[in-house]
């Protein structure tokens, strides 16, 4: 089937009142960026929906990219038809013959935005329903949940026919909720947290702590690859590598073993908050899931969070591990996340970390550190890399060249 346009429905944007125009403009920008590989496309966004004119581009290639753009409830590939009843009838019959298999039911859903057209919506439903039965006499009408829902829209310029409704990514357009710093480890949970934050409109920058030689180059690349998996949903991600070796060595030297993880996490949070301020972010996002590990009990969260007043978003905090894994598999981060490379949270992990650390003890042990100097040197050594679809493509080409 040769489609001529894709009709996009906004979903939650329809509830945004006075801010609606801003949300729609951001969505249009995000769609344009996601479909940048298709230069012939034209995008028209109005109050109720968006129309993507294909202009000869292949809908089969466009649809997978469009399905990852947050802010879209669903969309329908459509066929443009001359606004004359004989032409509309003929196309309806052609489409239903192509998609019908024995036992399927159908329904006609007509909408007439051009009120000068010869038939109203009810008239179109009746006329085109008759055309379907004429083409396939044995087909049955089903008004609720039909197998085939033929949608006809009569606009000023032409008539448009669609029969397929594809579920979108939902949520809000990325960029409408401000910027957040994602504490991206190499595990399963943090990429899922980033994905869920982006779904609510947050522009995410990834903060990753590296402690060479204790953590390897492969572990760092794994974190970058995880960030790359999130790129199709957002366009580009700034990957911020934080040198953490000196800090971890000093923590190990002066802090009792049971509090190593608590103090390590406090320093990570302090640094992430400092980076957030530098990068003009509003929130911190992490992959903490309540009581999953020692540093994620409520008592640990209290002892760690004390270092900042910045809001911390924990999208997976109440999820079971199986629920998190299900999303990780959906966004294709799971197999990558389970690769066995050490990260900063595991290299000096004590055999018996405190699950109920006391805040006063955490403050006492942290005071043994030269916080100002350690943080200043770490912040001076930040490495920021932009990860985009283009950089991912270049990496694939380099890997292929190495293989040859």
Curated annotation (Swiss-Prot):
Stored PROSITE patterns: THUMP
SUPFAM superfamilies: Adenine nucleotide alpha hydrolases-like (SSF52402), THUMP domain-like (SSF143437)
Subcellular location(s) per record: Cytoplasm
Pfam families, alphabetized: ThiI, ThiI_fer, THUMP
CDD domains the UniProt entry points to: PPase_ThiI (cd01712), THUMP_ThiI (cd11716)
UniProt keyword Nucleus present: no
UniProt-listed Enzyme Commission number(s): 2.8.1.4
BP GO terms, sorted: thiamine biosynthetic process; thiamine diphosphate biosynthetic process; thiazole biosynthetic process; tRNA 4-thiouridine biosynthesis
Pathway: Cofactor biosynthesis; thiamine diphosphate biosynthesis
GO terms of molecular function: ATP binding; CCA tRNA nucleotidyltransferase activity; tRNA binding; tRNA-uracil-4 sulfurtransferase activity
Membrane spanning stretches: none
Binding site for ATP: 183-184, 208-209, 265, 287, 296
First-tier enzyme category under EC: transferase
Cellular component GO terms, alphabetical: cytosol
Keyword vocabulary terms for this entry: ATP-binding, Cytoplasm, Nucleotide-binding, RNA-binding, Thiamine biosynthesis, Transferase, tRNA-binding
InterPro entries referenced in this protein's UniProt entry, alphabetically: Rossmann-like_a/b/a_fold, ThiI_AANH, ThiI_fer, ThiI_N, THUMP_dom, THUMP_ThiI, tRNA_STrfase, tRNA_sulfurtransferase_ThiI
Domain of life: Bacteria
Reaction catalysis annotation: [ThiI sulfur-carrier protein]-S-sulfanyl-L-cysteine + a uridine in tRNA + 2 reduced [2Fe-2S]-[ferredoxin] + ATP + H(+) = [ThiI sulfur-carrier protein]-L-cysteine + a 4-thiouridine in tRNA + 2 oxidized [2Fe-2S]-[ferredoxin] + AMP + diphosphate; [ThiS sulfur-carrier protein]-C-terminal Gly-Gly-AMP + S-sulfanyl-L-cysteinyl-[cysteine desulfurase] + AH2 = [ThiS sulfur-carrier protein]-C-terminal-Gly-aminoethanethioate + L-cysteinyl-[cysteine desulfurase] + A + AMP + 2 H(+)
Family the entry assigns: Belongs to the ThiI family.
HAMAP family: ThiI (MF_00021)
Name used for this protein in its record: Probable tRNA sulfurtransferase
Species of origin: Enterococcus faecalis (strain ATCC 700802 / V583)
